């Protein structure tokens, strides 16, 4: 098993660091229903599919890179593809550096959770960080 069953940690990283995760928002039942347009475009099914697809694609890339262990940077080609993938969604405004942080922190937590067979993940939106406790 490649540990993909722990992939929700990547959505948590996106929520904490990018302040964007339609998947995590849906899991927490925190969709923005007060605005039908935002609910449909930013929190709806297509946005969830975009995030899930992006997560699966990055995961497949990460397999060839030791799940980003020892990496201080994410390859520019991955970051550029992400920018293209999220065009038209509110998260397109996030700089590539935040995407890089989300990926690197998310994979650091993923590796710890996978190695330990689980764990408690904590996030801080103000500090844009996640970690394992």
Could you describe each region identified by the protein language model?
Residues 1-6, 10, 17, 22-133:
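Metalloprotease/metallohydrolase-associated module, dominated by Zn2+-dependent proteases
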């Amino acid at each position: 098993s490649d540990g993909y069953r722990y992939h929700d940690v990547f959505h948590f990283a996106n929520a904490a660091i990018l302040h964007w995760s339609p998947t995590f928002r849906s899991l927490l039942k925190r969709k923005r229903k007060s605005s039908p347009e935002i609910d449909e475009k930013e929190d709806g099914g297509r946005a969830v599919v975009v995030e899930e697809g992006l997560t699966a694609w990055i995961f497949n890339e990460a397999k060839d890179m030791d799940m980003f262990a020892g990496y201080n940077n994410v390859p520019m080609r991955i970051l550029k593809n992400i920018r293209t993938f999220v065009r038209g969604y509110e998260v397109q405004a996030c700089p590539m550096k935040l995407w890089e942080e989300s990926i690197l922190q998310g994979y650091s937590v993923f590796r710890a959770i996978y190695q330990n067979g689980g764990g408690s993940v904590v996030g801080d939106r103000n500090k844009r960080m996640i970690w394992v406790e």
